[in-house]
């Protein structure tokens, strides 16, 4: 079996259907005896150039180890699904299991946002406590 990196872009109006699509496509690969090494749902992102007058798309990345027949079947499924705007399948030399730079950047943003949200809440809680102490005196 060979290692592949697969990226596909889904129409932004079909974003709710992406989990089902991922399940269906990973099922195609695993039924052929394949293994999913990495699965990343990057969500809606800006496109580098418009595709069918669309400026955003839902991105999904897969790193898999499977047979060439399963990859051909997956590419056929991409072709017949109108919601899939673009897809790319690249053969790689080894399995890639570490998080991609896109996923790392998203995780960093999420941790920054959550820490920024906690800080104002903590300050507001302190102010409420101080005002409660002042009114109690």
UniProtKB/Swiss-Prot annotation:
GO molecular function, one term: structural constituent of ribosome
Annotated segments matching region Disordered: 96-137
Gene3D superfamilies: 3.30.70.60
Listed Basic and acidic residues bias regions: 104-124
Keywords, ordered alphabetically: Ribonucleoprotein, Ribosomal protein, RNA-binding, rRNA-binding
NCBIfam families per UniProt: S6 (TIGR00166)
Function per UniProt: Binds together with bS18 to 16S ribosomal RNA.
Identification of the protein by name: Small ribosomal subunit protein bS6
Organism whose genome encodes this protein: Shewanella halifaxensis (strain HAW-EB4)
Taxonomic lineage: Bacteria, Pseudomonadati, Pseudomonadota, Gammaproteobacteria, Alteromonadales
Gene: rpsF
């Amino acid at each position: 079996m060979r290692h592949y990196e697969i990226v596909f872009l889904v129409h932004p109006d079909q974003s709710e259907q992406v989990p089902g699509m991922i399940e269906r496509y990973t099922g195609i690969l695993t039924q052929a005896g394949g293994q999913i090494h990495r699965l990343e749902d990057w969500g809606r992102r800006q496109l580098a150039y418009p595709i069918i007058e669309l400026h955003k798309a839902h991105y999904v990345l897969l790193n898999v180890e499977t047979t060439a027949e399963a990859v051909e079947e997956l590419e056929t499924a991409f072709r017949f699904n109108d919601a899939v705007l673009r897809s790319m399948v690249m053969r790689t030399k080894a399995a890639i299991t570490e998080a991609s730079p896109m996923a790392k950047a998203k995780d960093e943003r999420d941790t920054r946002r959550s820490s920024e949200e906690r800080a104002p809440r903590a300050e507001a809680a302190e102010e409420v406590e101080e005002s409660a102490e002042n009114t109690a005196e």
